[in-house]
Amino acid sequence: MGCRPRGPRGQAERAGSRCQYHWPMTNRSRSFNVPDKPSLDGIEAKWVDVWDESGVYHFDRSKSREEIFAIDTPPPTVSGSLHIGHVFSYTHTDTVARFQRMNGKSVFYPMGWDDNGLPTERRVQNYYGVRCDPSIPYDPDFTPPEKPDPKNQVPISRRNFIELCERLTVEDEKVFESIWRRLGLSVDWRYTYATIDDKSRAVAQRAFLRNLARGEAYMAEAPTLWDVTFRTAVAQAELEDRERPGAYHKVAFHRDGGDPIIIATTRPELLPACVALVAHPDDERYQSLFGTTVRSPLFGVEVPVVAHRLADPEKGTGIAMICTFGDVTDVTWWRELKLPTRAIIGWDGRIVADPPEGLDSEEGRAAYAKLAGATVHTARQRIVEMLRESGDLIGEPEKITHPVKFFEKGDKPLEIVTTRQWYIRNGGRDPELREALLKRGQELDWYPEHMRTRFEHWVGGLNGDWLISRQRFFGVPFPVWYPLDDKGNPIYDSPILPDESQLPVDPSSQAPEGYTEDQRGKPGGFIGDPDVMDTWATSSLTPQIAGGWESDPDLFERVFPMDLRPQGQDIIRTWLFSTVVRSHFEHDCLPWKKAAISGWILDPDRKKMSKSKGNVVTPLSMLEKYSSDAVRYWAASGRLGTDTALDEKQMKIGRRLAIKILNASKFALSVAGEDTVADPAAVTEPLDRSMLAVLAEVVQDATAAFHEYDHTRALERTERFFWNLCDDYLELVKARAYDPESREGASARAALLIALSVLHRLFAPFLPFVTEEVWSWWQDGSVHVAKWPSVEEFRAAAEAGDPAVLAATSEVLHTVRKAKSEAKLSMRAEVERVTVHGKQAEQARLCRDDLAAAGRVTTLVFETTDDAELRVDVELAPAEK
């Protein structure tokens, strides 16, 4: 299904950039500039500067949509430092960007910073030792404490707090960018955005206003998941279960003329909030109670006994109390059974001072007074003791461990309080919309495919709409004001909205049209909506922000829908799903064609690495110790969707590989010389053609792997061939290649240059620095805009070759080397006689001279038999006496 653009369209200035594609297989004369002692030292800074100056990674927006590959780059959260997990997943994306660029695509590869929201606020609070208090007036001369104390934070105005957030995020972003550049990300930094900048705020506010106009966004006063530490609402997607100790308390409810009814609860402090008891309609034990009432202990409130299918006969005593609100099941029961509300927990997580409606008895109010003002934990302790004294606690609490819901960034269990919030419909209460969004998930190409299931499970399990408002400070404000009646009360049903041309707006500091600032907060005047958008409400619009939706229609038409969304598996339910929702509403299509999902980085104990767990490793030390290419090698060795351990051994291997590329390239170029032409027609020898035949298979496999978003397979295949080339082929042809006069020598030299050019380009997406360095020794331009290798470049020579020739010849050479090694002889030691037996002996015979020279063999005998296994007998030369 195509996208349907909404809203006005205009003209935008078109800015193009140079993008060259270089064919290395030419007959041009050239000079080599090979250093005497190649080294990795200094090449990163050197090439980062060159790439910046040349604009080699600039997006060419003059290209048509078919010629563009657009990436919806994840904007990392700017709240401290990057960790090695970021390097892991962003390297995956960069290999794709580089491959597509070498395939002739103009790559739209922007970078964003997710710099608004709670993580930034927490960092600012701890870094400067401050906290936001909106009741404090702005101080234009405020300076943060010289010695910040996170435990004794200085209260400051909202405006002062936001200024500190802006100041610190700018500094953090500079550090992030320097690390990304050092890693070699081929980002076009001209297209950088921040989720709190004016462009992002305008996009977020515009999308919200359109959602509101179409009925996709709405305000409701309802039970809300609430973090009492941060005093903000929390969405379903931000929850996590944590195992916590608790206890089942058996509590007696009383009824006239009958035995008490025993319920079991982990939250006895909610007894004053009890509005009913509930059991399963098929539970025979409680059939006679349905439709009757019982009295709550201590408080004496009459509550009905009701039936509902969600009651679990196997849990506790099979009958439970419904409180407003202990958990989301309470909310479901309250809503479906149309029960009253008796809220007792405030926004601060303490028991509110006034007893709830219905608690009328003197004894009940006296009992409640003992709880008022207490934290939930303290109230629980007090009420258990009160129940014990009254005889309504049956037995002692039974200790258990059970899952408790937390805000993913919070330290205390969530509560449910009634608040007024903004929501966007997401299918949680609309089966038709749910099916439409599930269909979007089916339209999307997932890499790996099994990640689709996580999306479907999340959408299928939604139990409410997406809560997008937050009671915080540093975020995108809702573009809404409310008129005040003659008593100064907000008229929420008649919001005042800005025109899109006025965006972005800040209702906390700007007056709406038709009002003046001195009418703020006064009867007959107005107030601004005090809340900000959840950070995902902005991040869900990254394709629109980066692509210039409405602000740059020409660019947007060229990049949207984007080609790829790369991201982590843990934010499928948040970032990926929310972006699908916004695009479905605004454009009636997916925001991208493909999703590439990275796995997690694990610490040495195989635990997920995360800032909250304190087990993260920052990348800078690894980059300095091993080099950027080495760290990229480790990252690229991890497949999409697969959890990967931080492994410095892999980085050491990557560094060794980069050094080997330097040295092998120097050797090959010194052997080939400047007069050699990389001409496939000059490749005439069986071993050379065989090597190119194997290389052709590598090119085909690596190319197919990249098209399937399997960068690891492309790297493994390329690396395996490279080491075989260095260990076997180079040794086999070394003597012949040094012969300047013979056709056989020219064949080896031409084959070497062809292989070198192809390998440099195959390695380029993974090891950008070392490949650019060696490419510059003998080629014009950048390897990163050179054409991705194709078998067509050397097809004639490859098709004339038999891969079995190189395999058989290499095996013979391995056996000869092994014999020398076991005899503790130098590899230059003479060999008297080598006899080769088996079906492959004939292939090895074709390379007799190369084998004799490489193995220093005096006599070579080939005996072709029907044996499938190649057998090699080695007779070493007699030791000198």
Curated annotation (Swiss-Prot):
Catalyzed chemical reaction(s): tRNA(Val) + L-valine + ATP = L-valyl-tRNA(Val) + AMP + diphosphate
Region (Disordered) residue spans: 493-526
Placement of sequence motif 'HIGH' region: 76-86
Motif placement: 'KMSKS' region: 608-612
Binding of ATP, residues: K611
GO biological process terms on file: valyl-tRNA aminoacylation
Protein keywords: Aminoacyl-tRNA synthetase, ATP-binding, Cytoplasm, Ligase, Nucleotide-binding, Protein biosynthesis
InterPro entries associated with the record: aa-tRNA-synth_I_CS (IPR001412), aa-tRNA-synth_Ia (IPR002300), Anticodon_Ia_Val (IPR033705), M/V/L/I-tRNA-synth_anticd-bd (IPR013155), Rossmann-like_a/b/a_fold (IPR014729), tRNAsynth_Ia_anticodon-bd (IPR009080), Val/Leu/Ile-tRNA-synth_edit (IPR009008), Valine-tRNA_ligase_type_2 (IPR022874)
GO molecular function, one term: valine-tRNA ligase activity
Keyword S-adenosyl-L-methionine: no
Subcellular location: Cytoplasm
One GO CC annotation: cytosol
Signal sequence residues: none
EC number: 6.1.1.9
CDD domains per record: Anticodon_Ia_Val
SUPFAM superfamilies for the chain: Anticodon-binding domain of a subclass of class I aminoacyl-tRNA synthetases, Nucleotidylyl transferase, ValRS/IleRS/LeuRS editing domain
Enzyme class: ligase
PANTHER family with a match to the protein in the record: VALINE--TRNA LIGASE, CHLOROPLASTIC_MITOCHONDRIAL 2, VALYL-TRNA SYNTHETASES
Assembly: Monomer.
UniProt remark on domains: ValRS has two distinct active sites: one for aminoacylation and one for editing. The misactivated threonine is translocated from the active site to the editing site.
Function (record text): Catalyzes the attachment of valine to tRNA(Val). As ValRS can inadvertently accommodate and process structurally similar amino acids such as threonine, to avoid such errors, it has a 'posttransfer' editing activity that hydrolyzes mischarged Thr-tRNA(Val) in a tRNA-dependent manner.
Family label: Belongs to the class-I aminoacyl-tRNA synthetase family. ValS type 2 subfamily.
Protein name: Valine--tRNA ligase
Organism field: Thermobifida fusca (strain YX)
